[in-house]
Amino acid sequence: MGEPKPVNFRHELKYLISSAEVTMLRTRLSGLISLDAHAKNGHYTIRSLYFDDYDDRCLLENENGTDPREKFRIRMYNGSADRISLECKRKERGMTHKTSCPLTREQTEFLMAGKIVPNVADRPPLLQKLTAQMMTRRLHPVVIVEYERIPFVYKNGNVRITLDTNLVSSSDVSQFLRERIPHRPVMPLGQQLLEVKYDAYLPDFLYQSLQLSDLRQTAYSKYALCRRYTR
């Protein structure tokens, strides 16, 4: 057997920005680095279904800055069920690590209903892990989070810079697989989100390109905000 792969934790910085700053950064970054190949029209829509227990432990850990902490979500793109994945995002010592595995539509429907996927012993380890926590902690789906993402990538440093706009949420988790879902906006008008992710270092020219007059790092969480707005 080969050696296990090392767990790759990444830096993840978040900033609240204005819609005008989104336009400015999009123009600036377009002249420096490439759009993600999956952004066929310059952007794509991300929809995530998050899990929590009946004590809202994931929400409270997020708001309290508990370290380490992790949360599970199911993710799809552009309202299409052709590509669905289960993800677990772990935060530890200020760094983040994400693991994922594909899901079928049938598996997703079981999880949406808070049910255990059949024959889970034959499934990927991540799905087995979620199943165990559904049984022991009673994890269940609690909120849908959706937004549009403009993603830029740069190979050196494995950099990913994203401009996330039009954040909306829904507590009707049964609608997750529909092409369009009923939702409500959760951000103040004109407020958007910048995320910067990288491995060991952020190239200086990219750091300089991100400088805005009042850019301030935040511990902002899409999940926590959407939970608060959909209660």
Task: Label every PLM stretch briefly.
Residues 1-231:
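Phosphate-end processing signature that detects enzymes handling 5′-triphosphorylated RNA
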